[in-house]
């Protein structure tokens, strides 16, 4: 079996920083450098081999490179990223396989985070602190109090978090994460708190889709 050296696809989302380049050796001219998709067959950000072939095309041409059990998967099953959150991400949720296949024509997203590093006092949002109704959810978005009913979880270097599809969550500022997730790019943004560093409007929130 050959060892494949991959070049990641990188993303310059507004909340990103520079630590993926300075601390983790990711080569990219993007500024900010928010994400590096280091193992990816997803069309929104494929990994590349040295000759310019995408990992997806290589796997299609050499299916045996994944071993004997890969035939049970319709597509490459995972996507691995490095994430540098210099600022807060949107509060968001990812759909289940059932919902995403029906409405987005791709798989949903369950993911896992490993905290590579973080600033003192860093935290993330992970789920509600109590069960809320649709009416309360809508009202708290309108009056900017949604974070009052979310679990704010302190994080430390080496922590690991499992985020099942359907869990409201957000990576907050000062955290660098390795993320292993399903091979999907479906995200419903629920709540944007700010836009950083550029003249721009927040991405349109798509939470209503999840409640219909």
Task: Give the role of each language-model region.
Residues 111-113, 170-194:
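A short hydrophobic beta-strand segment most commonly corresponding to one strand
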Residues 22, 81, 135, 144-151, ...:
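Flexible, active-site-adjacent loop/turn segments at secondary-structure boundaries
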Residues 132-162:
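Active-site glycine-rich loop that binds ribose-phosphate moieties when present
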Residues 1-132, 193-212:
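Transition-metal
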Residues 91, 154-173, 182:
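Conserved metal-binding segment of the jelly-roll/cupin
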Residues 99-100, 121-126, 132-137, 163-164, ...:
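Short, well-ordered, mixed-charge alpha-helical segments that flank or form enzyme active sites
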């Amino acid at each position: 079996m050959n060892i494949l050296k991959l070049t990641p696809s990188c993303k310059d989302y507004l909340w990103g920083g520079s630590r993926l380049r300075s601390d983790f050796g990711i080569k990219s001219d993007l500024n900010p450098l928010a994400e590096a998709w280091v193992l990816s067959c997803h069309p929104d950000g494929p990994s590349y081999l040295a000759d310019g072939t995408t990992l997806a095309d290589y796997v299609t041409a050499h299916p045996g490179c994944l071993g004997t059990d890969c035939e049970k998967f319709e597509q490459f099953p995972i996507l691995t990223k490095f994430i540098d959150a210099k600022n807060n991400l949107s509060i968001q949720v990812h759909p289940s396989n059932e919902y995403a296949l029906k409405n987005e024509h791709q798989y949903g997203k369950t993911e896992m985070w490993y905290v590579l590093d973080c600033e003192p006092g860093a935290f993330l949002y992970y789920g509600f602190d109590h069960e809320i109704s649709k009416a309360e959810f809508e009202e708290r978005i309108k009056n900017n109090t949604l974070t009052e009913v979310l679990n704010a979880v302190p994080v430390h270097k080496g922590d690991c978090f499992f985020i099942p599809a359907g869990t409201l969550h957000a990576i907050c500022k000062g955290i660098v994460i390795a993320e292993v997730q399903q091979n999907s790019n479906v995200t419903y943004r629920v709540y944007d708190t700010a836009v950083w560093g550029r003249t721009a409007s927040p991405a349109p929130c798509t939470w209503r889709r999840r409640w219909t």
